[in-house]
Each structure stands twice: as C-alpha cells, then as structure tokens.
Amino acid sequence: MLIKSQRLTLFSPLLSKTRRIPVNSHQTLVAESVITRRTLGAITATPSFHKNPVVIRRRIKLERVTRNCVRIDREIDEEEEEEEKERGDLVKQSIWEQMKEIVKFTGPAMGMWICGPLMSLIDTVVIGQGSSIELAALGPGTVLCDHMSYVFMFLSVATSNMVATSLAKQDKKEAQHQISVLLFIGLVCGLMMLLLTRLFGPWAVTAFTRGKNIEIVPAANKYIQIRGLAWPFILVGLVAQSASLGMKNSWGPLKALAAATIINGLGDTILCLFLGQGIAGAAWATTASQIVSAYMMMDSLNKEGYNAYSFAIPSPQELWKISALAAPVFISIFSKIAFYSFIIYCATSMGTHVLAAHQVMAQTYRMCNVWGEPLSQTAQSFMPEMLYGANRNLPKARTLLKSLMIIGATLGLVLGVIGTAVPGLFPGVYTHDKVIISEMHRLLIPFFMALSALPMTVSLEGTLLAGRDLKFVSSVMSSSFIIGCLTLMFVTRSGYGLLGCWFVLVGFQWGRFGLYLRRLLSPGGILNSDGPSPYTVEKIKSI
C-alpha cells in the first residue's frame, strides 16, 4: 500500500536554510506541528497548502458549520422577535383583562357610592324649586349631617378588613364576633351623634353662619334635628354594609341603597312638591329612607348566615386593634371632610345667593366625586396580594395601577364635561333665580379642573392604602388641610370671593395627586421595592 507524502516547508529566521519535513496525508497536522515545535524549540511552523484534499474537506465542513450557525442565529432572532411581540400582546391583553375585571368589580360598588349623594342632590333640586333661603340652609345642614357621616368611614374600613381576614382563615365564628363588636361601636357612636345634635345643633348652625345670614338658621336647625334621628341607623347600617363587602357581596347593599334612593325621591316629591312641607319634608323623606336602608342592610347580612342583631361589648385589646387600623384612615377622611366644610364656612359670609350657588355646585361636585371612589376600593381589594405575601408580583401591581390610571383619566374627563354641562347648560334643573345661576356659571372652570383630577387621585390614594403607607397618606391629608385652610382665609379676606375658594380646591386636588404619584414612582416606593416586603402576615393581620 502506497502512502502519499508531502513536504512541509519550514521557515525560520534562526536558520539560513529551509528544511522540508515529510508529512503524511493521513496524519494530523496539528500533532505534526507540535512535534516540530518540540524539535526546533522556538521555531514557528507555518504550513503552506496547495490543493490539499484534507484542507478542502475541512473548509467545506467549516462553511457548512458557518451556514448552520448563521441560520440558527437567524432563527433565534426571529423567535426572540416573536416572543417579544407575544409579550407585548400579553401585556396589552393583561391590561385589557384587568380593566374589564375592574369595571365588573366597581359596577355594584359605584351604585352604592352614588346613592348617598343622589339623595342629597334630590333634596337640593326639590327644595331649590321653592325657597332660596331653604336652599341656602341646606349648606350647613348637609355639612352637619352628610359630611359628618363620612367621618365614620373608619368603621367601614375596619369592618371590611377584619371580616375579610377572618374569612380568609375560614373562621366564621371570629367573623361573627367582630361583626357584633363593630355593630356595638356603630350603635354607640350613632347614639352619641343623636345626643350631640339635640344638645348642640342650634349652636353649631349659628356658629357656622358666623352671625351672618341669620335667616337660614331656623330652617337649617329644623333640617339637622330631623335628620339626626337617623344617626344610630346610619352607622349600624354602615357596619352591616361593610361586613357584606368584606364577604364580597356587593349586590345586597346595592339593593338596599337603591330602595332608599327611590323612597327618598318619592318622599321629597310628595312632601315637598304636593304637600308644601319644604325643607322639613325633605329631611323626613331622607330620614325614612336611611332607616329602611339600614334594615335592608342587616337583612342582607342575615341571609349570609350571620346574626346582624347581635351586639358585643369590645375588650380593651379589641379597641386598640381597631383604633390602630382605623386611626390613620380617620385622620385622612376627617381632614378631607373638614376642608370641604371650611369652604362652605367661608361661603356663608358671602351672602345668601352666593351660598346657594355654592350649595348647588358642591352637591353636583359631590355627586360626580363618588364615581371615582370605587377605583380606590378596587385598589384596596386587588393590590394587597400583589404587593406582599406569597403571591407578590410587583410588575402585575404596576400594570394594575396603570389600568386604574387609564380608567381614572378617562372617567375624570367624562365627569368634568358632564358635570360642567348640566349646571352650565341646564341651570333651571336646580333653581330659577337669575342671581344664583350667574354665580354658578362663574365657577364652571375651577369646577372642571378640580373634578377631572379626582378619579386619578383616589386611585393613587387607594394604592397607598393597600400598601399600608398609612402615615404618608394621613400626613399628606393633614398638611393639605392646614395649607388649604390658611389659603382659604387669605383668599376670603383678600376679596377673591367664591371663585377664589374653588381655585383653592383645584390646588388641593392636584397637589395631592402630585404627592401621591411621586411617592409611588420613587425608587423606594411600594411598587418598586425589589427587596422582601416589610409587611408580613404576622405584622399585618387585617389585609
């Protein structure tokens, strides 16, 4: 068998002559080069091939490998592009699914929030058809009745959280005990408010008018004395409603409030328009509707398998637990209600017609305001499981906030347009007094600016409450209240009138929006903290 051989030419600057080394075609070139280097020491071997079949085959293999690598790389790029596109589609789909879930959840809740202001708005519309003095008297009347009831929303927060926690532990007995304790607290608070209204109602109305517009004091006092009879029913019904929400039952409370709204509307129509009872008739209609609503709330709770007529005295430890959860929320709500009330307080010194115009715009604003509150409730219901615990998912929480902000911005614009159009284009719905209508039209611009920010602001606030950033929320609200009240005093004394007061309200809303947004977008915010959550199950038992 013949073995073909070739000669390998070696060049070296250390050798004057060229040396040829035979190389068999079936031998490995690399090994031969290693042997040559070992033999010649520092001599470098540089092979020179001329149409070597082995080299040609290796080049062909190299080209094939290169082509395969290029093809595989191209396929990988295409797959990455497809995956990125799919991720984008999933993000869009996730946002869309979340938005649909939000709308489905907030539907019944929105109806519940609307019923209360709707009853006050019905009173405003009906009374406005008769007397301008009684319409102005509704200003301090609604503050001492409706606005004060919102101060007790801390009972609602405590009830829904504590009941939801007990049900999560599948401890129905504990849930029943907590409902009984909170029903007792609601009853005691209601009786105290009834007593305070009876004893200090006339003094409160007189102090609210600051010795001016004395003509509205008798009508306003009559209104709050009648409405005050419903205080125990209002707060007991509030606890029953919140317990149902903690059980994720929103239809029962919605039916109760819808029935109350219908009763209030029929009562106002019969007592005020047909029987001429005026503001007293409106107060009796609202009181009756609230009593019926409380009974239906408790009946709905009984249908869930709980005893809504069981009351239990809380222990000191239970009172401390409730106060620790509810105190920051109480400060926040109290600051907000106090600021709105202070605007009415400033308006009482500007004349009866100005106060009546503010009453109309304030009731319309409050009616539109509650449309955004379910977004806050949604954040408090869906965010906790994403922010801490075993199912912590910060990207999903950020996506949920994005969905809430999209809905909030859209809702704010819609509410701003509709809320401005009704008093602007159809003021006769509220009153036929030309002076009052003129004052209403002056407030349309700040009315739109303040209303458009509300849904987004409450979405951010609800997210912070879900993340248990309670100290920050309460500090923002309390500081905003102080700064806002000082600004209102300056504006009133400087002669800017009711228009200046409403622009202070614009600053109050947009200032809170900016502070909340900055807090959530900060690197150490609850939506951007990649470290372990500081809120463990042991520390937070009311989630």
From Swiss-Prot:
GO terms for molecular function: antiporter activity; xenobiotic transmembrane transporter activity. InterPro entries: DinF-like, MATE_fam. It is found in: Plastid, Chloroplast membrane. CDD domains: MATE_DinF_like. Disruption phenotype: Enhanced susceptibility to several bacterial pathogens and alterations in PR-1 gene expression. No salicylic acid (SA) accumulation after pathogen inoculation and more susceptibility to both virulent and avirulent forms of Pseudomonas syringae and Peronospora parasitica. Age-related resistance (ARR)-defective. Defect in stomatal response during bacterial infection. Keywords: Chloroplast, Coiled coil, Immunity, Innate immunity, Membrane, Plant defense, Plastid, Transit peptide, Transmembrane, Transmembrane helix, Transport. The chain crosses the membrane at residues 107-127, 135-155, 181-201, 228-248, 256-276, 278-298, 319-339, 342-362, 406-426, 443-463, 472-492, 497-517. GO terms for cellular component: chloroplast envelope; chloroplast membrane; plastid. Residues 1-30 form a transit peptide. Belongs to the multi antimicrobial extrusion (MATE) (TC 2.A.66.1) family. This is Protein DETOXIFICATION 47, chloroplastic. It comes from Arabidopsis thaliana. The lineage of its organism: Eukaryota, Viridiplantae, Streptophyta, Embryophyta, Tracheophyta. The gene is DTX47.
